[in-house]
Amino acid sequence: MKIVFSTKNVSRATFLDTCCYAFDYGFEGFEIYDAIKERSTHHDSILRQYRISDAKRKLLNRNLAVSALRMPDSLESGNTTADLVEKYVDMAASSGIANIIVRIDKEVSFDVLEEKISGAVKKAEQAEISILFETMGYLADTEKVIGIINHFSSAAIGAS
């Protein structure tokens, strides 16, 4: 996928409107920022179990794809729990979205990372979903990203 945008600062009334926006401006797709909010805001969201096939048709008809689900809070945040990360993996898997993007804003111990994402990594491996660490801020240092990838030793972990 070449050109995509994040829905973080894009406000559209429906999932279809977001698809039309992407198509009209020549994007090849978009990443969904804050999947929980997306699912509750858009009645026609690809993240709603009973709307997946309809939403996929909206994407397919415009030659678009959802490239990733992006978590709004960093992993070290109190708002990000192990259950939430696993929920993102489940939503991505059921919706046919290949990637989840997470971030770390400051140094955190591997114990905290294990607590927050080890269950999600196992689920992601089984569902062939990639958990990608955003390489900016604290993780702009390539060695730090490689350290995380090596720590988990999983094909489900990568960098964005």
Predicted features along the sequence, with ranges:
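Active-site groove signature of glycoside hydrolases
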Residues: 92-111, 127, 132-136
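Structural detector of well-ordered beta-strand residues that form the stable sheet scaffold
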Residues: 4, 67, 101, 132, ...
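N-terminal pre-domain/capping segments
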Residues: 1-98, 154
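A generic short-segment signal for beta-strand/edge and adjacent turn/coil regions
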Residues: 35-38, 81, 100-102, 113-114, ...
